[in-house]
């Protein structure tokens, strides 16, 4: 009996009701997605996307969301983001917009783009400022963003250092080349010796400038780390306050998750170098503003 039921589900349905046929195709796409057969699911969704009536808003949204999620899993993130942006522009209420923002968050997380992930979370928090889990995700994103930005700055500094060093060497040996490998100072004309002395002075200036740049970049990296840590810390504090607020209303596994998350936040807060006075001030500001 069950086998016949599945056979009916997979066979093409000959029906005069187009809506019924399209609905069946959508369910096939949903099943393929659940089985992680993303290419097959995408084909099912795409086959009905253009056939849906312009008045069938609900199914059209569901199908487009399914397409975007499949594209993200298949590594086609830009196409997925285009669909998500289109859905965001057409959102008519808070529920629709929330669904779209969670879709964008999933795509950006899959893309591992921390800055876009943070932007999506900020928009979600603007809609739902008292959701502790979004605040927790925002804190984690900031926690990961700091080292990523610091590494990018370090890479930029390293590249600039190599470029500057190469220019210094070239200015010191302006005639360098394969024929100059056997040249010695005593074989060079007197004018070249004066040129070497002048270039030596320029080299010292270049090295000093390079050192100043390196110091500046190091300060910038430290500033970036402190700033992102401060934002992560503030978001963690906000998460903890909201969890404490909802704690009396919870029981069973919900309460267990709440308490476990609070303990995890407490452990992560110990990794910050902020003084207790600073943490108390952040908490006071968070309470007084109602949201951050």
Curated annotation (Swiss-Prot):
Designated name of the protein:
Zinc fingers and homeoboxes protein 1, isoform 2
The taxonomic lineage of its organism, from the top, reads: Eukaryota, Metazoa, Chordata, Craniata, Vertebrata
Provide the gene name from the record.
Answer: ZHX1-C8orf76
């Amino acid at each position: 009996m069950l086998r016949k039921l599945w056979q009916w589900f997979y066979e093409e349905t000959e029906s005069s009701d187009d809506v019924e046929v399209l609905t069946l195709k959508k369910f096939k796409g949903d099943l393929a997605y659940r089985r992680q057969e993303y290419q097959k699911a995408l084909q099912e969704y795409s086959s009905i996307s253009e056939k849906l009536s312009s008045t069938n808003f609900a199914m059209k949204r569901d199908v487009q969301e399914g397409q975007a999620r499949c594209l993200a899993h298949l590594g086609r993130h830009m196409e997925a983001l285009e669909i998500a942006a289109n859905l965001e522009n057409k959102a008519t209420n808070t529920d629709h917009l929330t669904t779209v923002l969670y879709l964008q968050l999933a795509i950006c997380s899959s893309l591992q783009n921390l800055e876009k992930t943070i932007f999506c979370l900020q928009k979600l928090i603007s809609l739902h400022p008292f959701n502790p889990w979004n605040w927790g995700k925002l804190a984690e994103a900031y926690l990961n963003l700091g080292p990523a930005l610091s590494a990018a700055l370090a890479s930029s500094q390293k590249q600039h250092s190599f470029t500057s060093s190469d220019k210094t060497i070239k200015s010191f040996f302006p005639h360098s080349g394969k024929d100059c490998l056997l040249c010695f100072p005593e074989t060079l004309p007197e004018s070249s010796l004066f040129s070497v002395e002048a270039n030596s002075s320029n080299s010292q200036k270049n090295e000093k400038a390079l050192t100043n740049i390196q110091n500046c970049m190091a300060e910038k990296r430290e500033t970036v780390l402190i700033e992102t840590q401060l934002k992560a810390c503030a978001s963690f504090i906000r998460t903890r306050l909201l969890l404490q607020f909802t704690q009396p209303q919870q029981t069973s596994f919900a309460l267990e998750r709440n308490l476990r998350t609070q303990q995890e936040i407490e452990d992560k807060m110990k990794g910050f170098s902020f003084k207790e006075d600073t943490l108390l001030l952040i908490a006071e500001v968070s309470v007084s503003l109602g949201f951050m």
